Amino acid sequence: MTPRALLAVVTLSLAACTVASKPDGNGSAMVAPDSMESVVKRTFTTYGFRLQSGQTLPEMTLAFETYGRLAPDGRNAILVTHGGTSSQHMAGKYSPTDPAPGGWDTLIGPGKAIDTNKYFVVSSNVLGSSYGSTAPASINPVTGKRYGPDFPEISMHDIVTAQRTLLRGLGVHRLVAVVGPSYGGYQAFQWSVSYPDDMAGIAAVITAPKGSGKEADVQALVDRFAKDPNWNGGWHYDRGGIPDTLTTLRIETLTRYGYNEILAEKFPTQADRDAEIRRRAEPWAKEFDPNSMVTMRRAAVRYGAEKDFSKIRARVLYVISRSDKLFPPSIAPDVMDKLAKAGVDAKYFQIDTEFGHSATGVEWAKWGPTLKAFVEGLSQ
């Protein structure tokens, strides 16, 4: 990388966290301690970021958060990668008055499966996403206007290379692990084949080593957006966006992800559950750029790590939810067989749950000890 490309602007204020509990040491009988507080939103910017396609982003920013502290030798870092429609806010709160902590707060923190008393955890917003990283809604510094639908095509390799650039900027040169659910699991697998010497292990959760769907599915998504009168060929920004279309899409997604089952105890009637799912869908629909959905979906359908399994040097923990409709347990035997044939040290764990694709946070107690033991075993 050129000296100019290494020029980066990083907000270096560390995320403060309360350290109120001691690690349990054996990965069993875990109790989720209180949430961390005062998590700080941070950004990293570099210049002249070259994509796999040969195109270059003149300026590339990643939004990120950190939990815990980096050891003096820089070798205690864990990268946590997020799902496709979620954000980098994986643990803690920005303010004590926030209604809820980050999505994996039950798993990340002092004494938890990913123990911030031991590890420096980095969670960055995916390149192309809608939560602060360079994406279609960003201003192109060359034109002074949003990229919009003209945003360059990116690959899963580009996504993890951007993360690697961030980590280098933070002083991290080798990871203990890359851990992530769903789209984050795609990234974990991609890390293991793109940069096999950069981590001791990966935990790929409710995911697969290859993308689902085809290019036609990307076009079908665009066609669906095009039915909204505000779409305007993707230039929807000055027309108020397409929140109604995105709300409907989000409701479908949350339902498919298992939210009916998750909400059943608190909301016993279907009408109440439907109302709660809509309540959760509407804010997301106002902030997520549909062009980001297209960009990330295209990267996903073109993604495939299986052909490069022979490159993997990291240990692998592969986790699937028994009731997941997106990545059902039926895919696991083939994945594990291919990993074994490639000589990969891999372990499989199935979460026994009715909560489908959304099980990992709410069912933390069922698989958190396995994750904790795996991560801590990487340091031995």
Predicted regions and their residues:
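Catalytic-loop region of hydrolases
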Residues: 19-80, 84, 88-89, 93-94
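N-terminal cap/lid subdomain of alpha/beta-hydrolase-fold enzymes
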Residues: 65-140
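Conserved acidic catalytic loop of the alpha/beta-hydrolase fold
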Residues: 142-150, 157-177
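Conserved hydrolase catalytic core segment
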Residues: 174-213
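Alpha/beta-hydrolase-fold enzymes
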Residues: 198-283
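Short beta-strand/loop motif that positions the catalytic acidic residue
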Residues: 312, 318-320, 324
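Catalytic active-site module of serine/aspartate enzymes centered on a nucleophile-bearing elbow/loop
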Residues: 340-380
